[in-house]
Amino acid sequence: MAGVTQPKPAGASEPPFARAASQASIELYWLPLGAGGWLVRLNGRIYEAIHAFLERRRPLDLYHSALIVQVPEGRFVIEDAWPIPDADGPSSRGVAVEGPVGSRRMARWRVFRYEVRRWRDGVIADASEAVASPQLLSDDPLVARRLLDVVGSLPSPVWGRDELKTGEMWNSNSVIAWVLAQSGLSTDAIGPPAGGRAPGWQAGLITARHQQLSDEQAGHGAGDATSRVGRPGVAATA
């Protein structure tokens, strides 16, 4: 397993997916929150301005994270997305898990659900705007396969709320942090670009650690996802 490599500078001209099909890798992408969408970007700035004021610090850039995982069998995009564009996620976008947004009561409608993709040959929207990316986290094929395996075992707490009592709301960064931790990778040196932060990241790490401790106490292996926090998937009726 390789350590975290020095990231490429922002705007690097090398195509982000230019890798040999037989090479194994786990690459992390940091995308500015709201890249390609002014409303999300505006809401993010307001959110960060409020938090910066309350914490008596300067506002930081906010980031959304995603992964590209290469194994000999193919290349996969791991990303949390909301809103869900249509009902064809499992077949067209490799959706592995869905969860509620804002409230479980509203999750019967697709607009109030998020989806976690394990998308073969998928794309990351606005990948060209990623900052200090990609970061190579591992080139170990066993770790890469393990990461792909654990995606389907993700908990599905309410997006945008601290349902798991971690001190942070659950969001897309929580998903990426959780799968990295559950894959066995060290997350100590992983973080957003300088001058930025990734809300929800610690929620994913804390949840993964709680599950690992629960599994150990129950006599399961570290990689066994028998113990769950939250409920994987929600019924889709819209």
Give the residues covered by each predicted segment.
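Compositionally biased, low-complexity flexible segments
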Residues: G221-T226, P232-G233
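Short, surface-exposed recognition loops or helix-turn segments adjacent to catalytic cores
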Residues: R161-M169, A189-A198
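Short helix-capping/linker segments at secondary-structure and domain boundaries
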Residues: G74-R75, A181-A189
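Active-site nucleophilic cysteine motif
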Residues: L62, G160-S183
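Short terminal or interdomain "cap/linker" segment that borders an active site or interface and mediates
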Residues: P193-H220, A236-A238
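Non-catalytic ligand/cofactor/substrate-binding and regulatory segments of enzyme domains
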Residues: A2-T166, H210-L213
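Intrinsic disorder/low-complexity segments enriched in polar/small residues
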Residues: P7-P9, Q217-A218, T226
